[in-house]
Amino acid sequence: KTTFIKKYASYLLKKGMNIGILENDFGAVNVDMMLLQDLMGDNCELEMVSGGCDADCHRRRFKTKLIAMGMCGYDRVIVEPSGIFDVDEFFDALHEEPLDKWYEIGNVIAIVDAKLAEDFSAEADYLLASEVADAGCVLLSRSQEATEEEIHSTKEHLNRALGQIQCKRRLDSEIMDKNWDDFT
């Protein structure tokens, strides 16, 4: 995820945009923030919501950060969830006041390992499905390291997980499995 965010943020900065990146992490040390530090500058700010508290506290912290960032006048705000994230929390927050007046959801991009394991628990499959259900596109990470069979298996797993949560959507052309270095 961080590699993609770094590439995407660099692209937006080259376009002259003023951006904010919100790292949503549950770890004590946020490695992602350290990896993104070199993007910081006049047109890019990094913020973090750290975990270590209950779900209600985390939702309050997340919303508070989004409110503060909403007052900064960014052209784009990139929200990076932790590896396991309740996507409903994101959508719910953006539909509450005052965020509903400041933010418009643009691109929802889900990033999934091209070599996704087959043996997920029901809970993990639920989280996986919730993360891809509303995505405009699903980017497979490390696709250049995966075989055609592994990529096909990952695509089947995504659609099976969607079916398990009674989601009628099936992913096909929304899944991008090319090397990220080839993106323009």
For every predicted segment, state its role:
Residues 42-45, 51, 165-167, 174, ...:
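Generic structural motif recognizing short loop/turn segments at the entrances and edges of beta-strands
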Residues 2-121:
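Nucleotide-state-sensitive switch-loop elements of NTP-binding domains
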Residues 72, 76-171, 176:
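Phosphate/Mg2+-binding loops and adjacent switch elements
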Residues 1-10, 174-184:
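P-loop NTP-binding site
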